[in-house]
Amino acid sequence: MSSLAALGPAKSGLISWSENLPPKVRANVDPIRTAIAAADAEGLAREVTAEATRRLSEFVTGIRAYRNHPYRRPPTQARPVWQDGSSRLLDYGGRGRPVLLVPSLINRAEILDLRPGASFCAWLRDNGHRPLLLDWGVPGEAETDFDLGAYIGERLGGALDAATKLAGGPVPMVGYCMGGLLTLAAALAHPGKVAGLALLATPWDFHADQSGQTGMLATAAALPSEPGTPPLPIDLIQALFASLQPNLIQAKFRRFATMDPDAPETEAFVALEDWLNDGVELAAPAARDCLIGWYRDNTPARGAWKVAGQAIDPADLTCPAFVALPTRDRIVPPASAGALATALPDPTVIEPRAGHIGMMIGSRAESALWEPLGTWLKIEC
């Protein structure tokens, strides 16, 4: 439908082309401009309308197929071993050494235990480790005024204490996405409790690749600062991340409309989509820290991010470090995460050929991430 809206201005020459287009794209600009100018206006409008209608119909069909699919995620078999407010530490068992897993604040922790066959937690348990998953939960009354420092100090700090008690000593931590930044701060605050730190698709230089940040910065400017401000709604958070790939939603549901409802990949799609659509609100002070401190002011890369008065400097990390840089990540650009790898002292670095989420739960996740990370945990931690 966006093509239909742009047709008139494009035909009249009112749409200018960006000077920053990649060379391969720019090579097609002149032929497209010439073809539009030469086309019969009414005929072109009919063709564009027909194509837009077809795509919209496929999109709606895909959404209906998704909503009617019978798959439901089975209940987790993990048991809570610690809780504070809305946050819990889930123990997946296993005879190996405890490993503390820390996901992002803005998505459900289930991405690390998505479904049978796509569960990092289950793989760790079955391969000589004892995964402990920090489930941040949904912000409630106790978390209304939590900033990132409160989440790190009170919730992550409490979970780390519980994990070290179970282990009888320091434990390795694995932070995914935003969770990596939080674990880095915790590791610097409690070096004696952390045996190693793995950072998976973790941003650091938020200005290294600013594509898609317009929505983030606009939201940051509109955030109120009064105490007791309600959490940032999940619908707004999802809209911000959807803006990074504006055409992805319609494309994936059009593709889903053509998939066999009984195929394993269809179940995988539904499981992931259920997780994406079941996001978590973000406490307003924490949202300000992220959108203003990180995205607008780039405090981590500038050396200006502080937690409880301590500057968060990766160079100060004393335990072994592991960094995963997925090369096809659209959520955390490789340049942003790569800056963290550069700032750490002698980390082990891998570069899975995957996206932000595919690295963790895709068909090649075991060989691309789980196995090298599991080996590193056993050798270095």
List each model region and its residues.
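Alpha/beta-hydrolase-fold enzymes
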Residues: 1-37, 169, 182-285
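Short, surface-exposed "cap/lid" segments of acyl-processing enzymes
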Residues: 66-67, 72-140
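Alpha/beta-hydrolase active-site loop
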Residues: 145-165
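Short beta-strand immediately N-terminal to the catalytic nucleophile in serine-hydrolase-like folds
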Residues: 173-175, 200, 324
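Gly/Ala-rich beta-loop-alpha elbow adjacent to hydrolase catalytic centers
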Residues: 174-183
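Short beta-strand/loop motif that positions the catalytic acidic residue
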Residues: 317, 323-325, 329
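Short alpha-helix in the alpha/beta-hydrolase fold that links the catalytic acid
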Residues: 319, 333-342
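Catalytic histidine-centered segment of alpha/beta-hydrolase-like enzymes
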Residues: 331-334, 354-368
